Amino acid sequence: LGHHLNDVIETTVMGMFYGAQIQGMMPKLHSTNFEGMELIRPLYRINEKDIISWCKYNSLEFIRCACRFTENDESSHENISKRKEIKDLIAELKKINPNIEKNIFNSIHTANFDTLPGYKIFGEEHTFLDYYYGDKNDRSI
C-alpha cells in the first residue's frame, strides 16, 4: 500500500480528534478480507515531501488516488476533507514545534499503558481496574 509517514501521523491525530481514540497505522498486517494475505506499507517511514521530490527528480507523475477521502477541490471549502484540515493544522503546529510530526509518530510507538485508564487489544476492551486490585507485579496485557 502507498501509505507514507504523513498518513500515519494524520491518521493518529484524526483518531484522537474525530474518533475519540488513540490509534495508529500498522506497517504490516494480515488482511481481514483475504485469508493468508499480508498488507505491507513500504513507505511507512518515508515523508510525503521526500516522495514528491523523488518523483519530480525522476519525472514521474502520480496516478489519481482510489481513496475518495483524499479527493478535494481546493477552490471549494465544502469539499476540503478532514485529513486536509489535520494536515494544515500539523503544518501550523510545526511552526511552534518543529519536532511535532516526529513526536506524534513516536507517541504511537512508545505508548505507556501504565498511564492509560483504558485500552483495547485484539478487539477486547480493558481498564486499569483489570489489574488495579490484583497482583501488582502482573502487568500483562
Q: Where in the sequence are the language-model features?
A:
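AMP-forming adenylation/ATP pyrophosphatase catalytic core
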Residues: L29-G36, N58, N106-I141
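Mid-to-C-terminal catalytic subdomains of enzymes
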Residues: H4, I46-N106
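Membrane-targeting and insertion segments and their boundary/processing signals
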Residues: M25, E74-E78, D135
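Phosphate/oxyanion-binding loops and surfaces in catalytic or ligand/nucleic-acid-binding neighborhoods
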Residues: G15-A20, I96, S107, A111-D114
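Active-site adenylate/phosphate-handling loop in enzymes that bind or generate adenylated species
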Residues: L1-K49, I104, I121, E125-F128
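A short, terminal or domain-edge coil/loop segment
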Residues: E10-M16, W54-F62, K87-A91, Y119-D135
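Secondary-structure transition/capping residues
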Residues: G24, N97-E101, T115-Y119
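Surface-exposed, flexible loop/turn segments at secondary-structure boundaries
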Residues: D7, T70, N112
